[in-house]
Amino acid sequence: MRSKKMTHGLEKAPHRSLLYALGLTREELSRPLVGVVNSANEVVPGHIHLHTIAEAVKAGVRAAGGTPMEFPAIAVCDGLAMNHEGMRFSLPSREIIADSIEIMATAHPFDALVFIPNCDKSVPGMLMAMLRMNVPSILISGGPMMAGTGNGKAADLITVFEGVGMVRQGRMTEDELEQLSETACPGCGSCAGMFTANSMNCLSETIGLALPGNGTTPANSAARVRLAKHAGMRVMELLERDIKPRDIVTEKAVANAVAADMALGCSTNTVLHLPAVFAEAGLDLTLGIFDEVSRKTPNLCKLSPAGDQHIQDLHRAGGIPAVMAELDKAGRIHRDALTVTGRTVGENLDALGAAVRDHDVIRPMEKPYSPQGGIAILYGSLAPEGAVVKQSAVAPEMMQRTARARVFESEEAAFEAIMAQRIEKGDAIIIRYEGPKGGPGMREMLSPTAAIAGIGLGADVALITDGRFSGGTRGAAIGHVSPEAADGGPIGLVREGDMIEIDIPARKLDLLVDEAEMERRRAAFTPVVKEVTSPLLKRYSRLVTSAANGAVYKR
């Protein structure tokens, strides 16, 4: 066993002394040692209950003959970090999480690992660490929050964000907004729509690194606790059979994940996170692959923010297994891909009797919301290396549009203009120097997009940025424009009043400026370099690569 490096032999008597100091017995040290990575904290609603999940995991490990040893991981709440300097630290936290787990799991050589994330960057960060360490492992997340209420309707955090713009428009009072804010998020769990956290938790199932039910079983349910116990027991079986993450994460797992991503209408952040995760297994997931899969995979679900339904509705309709079963009908799933159950995807679907129980939530393959997937990759003179849009959340009027550029050098400047009602129908808001390097940190632009929707311009205004978007963003929000402005990308050359052509069906994003003028602008162009005081962000800016590559570190 790997743990023998710190438990066995004459020379390890000092190590055993330290382990005995933890209260462990000789019998416990003779069993496999299982690291339990718990990202619980009292700051993030999606993580407030993870101690309960961890206790269930440890009970499962003990029941199966192992000795669990818990250690912590950080987790940022993107909602709380939104629209201020804190958001610059969110994406970098993904790498910090992966690196810190590598440190702990190498310094203390556990035989197996159980990962307990829930919200945005904790899931990809832990998946990256899992593949990097490549010891028998399983992921069990905290589960989704239930939808809240507002004005007698289902509501979630995005309802509140959009309410800010509604107040400015006079369509809601501040008191009404405060009442909504008290009821929209009713308790623990990752925010209730198909936002980034739930997207990644659902996709962890499709990759095969989490048990069926991981993505949709509610956070506040006894079923979630039972699932955590099963995860603890299951990791012991993976250890016994020596099944490691890289045995599971193959090109077939990549294909399954991207197909499910498109069918579910997941967050555009998956286009950053999946390449970063799969890179740890030596697998290359390019924007071209996303686009290829999107063109031939129908969009079967429209959960919030694209529609009115939530993760609890997806769970009731059969969850991720039902979506995969529907995709399987058209041969879009690799049934022979291995999973942490020890069985293949196909065997899991058959054993579960996976089927859609509500076709209003999960559309049949022959009657999808759209014949193409939820995410589209755009290219053109404004985005030579690509840009990303959640086309399933774009109003029909904005799928093809020529718009007038309104240029802003930061999120704050754009948000101020929106709230001051200086943005008009037909505008394309350009927010630049918000990329991974130039931000630095690639902030999410949820506040501006929610404000656009809140003031009633969601079907009339586009937002284009080298930054990124929340999974809760809806509308013509085109992000990850690459190269970014800080790397000399064309987005840095856009001027106020330029015309921009958006053609999502044709996958085009073009700046309608002739080449001679572009050459003059390039010759006079010097990228803006922001003053950065944080040592972490300085290092991040030096090390990070393009969003087109998942914003991973240089290798």
Swiss-Prot record:
Disulfide bonds: none
Reaction(s) this enzyme catalyzes, per UniProt: (2R)-2,3-dihydroxy-3-methylbutanoate = 3-methyl-2-oxobutanoate + H2O; (2R,3R)-2,3-dihydroxy-3-methylpentanoate = (S)-3-methyl-2-oxopentanoate + H2O
Pfam families linked to this entry: ILV_EDD_C (PF24877), ILVD_EDD_N (PF00920)
GO cellular component, one term: cytosol
One Gene Ontology term of the molecular function aspect: 2 iron, 2 sulfur cluster binding
Keyword Iron-sulfur among record annotations: yes
Domain of life: Bacteria
Modified residues (N6-carboxylysine): K121
Signal peptide: none
GO annotation terms (biological process): isoleucine biosynthetic process; L-valine biosynthetic process
Pathway in which the depicted protein is active: Amino-acid biosynthesis; L-isoleucine biosynthesis; L-isoleucine from 2-oxobutanoate: step 3/4; Amino-acid biosynthesis; L-valine biosynthesis; L-valine from pyruvate: step 3/4
Residues the entry annotates as binding [2Fe-2S] cluster: C119, C191
InterPro entries recorded: Dihydro-acid_dehy_C, DihydroxyA_deHydtase, DiOHA_6PGluconate_deHydtase_CS, ILV_EDD_C, ILV_EDD_N, IlvD/EDD_N
Cofactor: [2Fe-2S] cluster; Mg(2+)
Residues binding Mg(2+): D78, D120, K121, E444
Active-site feature positions: S470
Plastid in keyword set: no
EC number(s) reported in the record: 4.2.1.9
Keywords: 2Fe-2S, Amino-acid biosynthesis, Branched-chain amino acid biosynthesis, Iron, Iron-sulfur, Lyase, Magnesium, Metal-binding
Cofactor: record remark: Binds 1 [2Fe-2S] cluster per subunit. This cluster acts as a Lewis acid cofactor.
PANTHER family the record matches: D-XYLONATE DEHYDRATASE, D-XYLONATE DEHYDRATASE YAGF-RELATED
Family: Belongs to the IlvD/Edd family.
Known role: Functions in the biosynthesis of branched-chain amino acids. Catalyzes the dehydration of (2R,3R)-2,3-dihydroxy-3-methylpentanoate (2,3-dihydroxy-3-methylvalerate) into 2-oxo-3-methylpentanoate (2-oxo-3-methylvalerate) and of (2R)-2,3-dihydroxy-3-methylbutanoate (2,3-dihydroxyisovalerate) into 2-oxo-3-methylbutanoate (2-oxoisovalerate), the penultimate precursor to L-isoleucine and L-valine, respectively.
Subunit structure: Homodimer.
Protein name: Dihydroxy-acid dehydratase
Gene label: ilvD
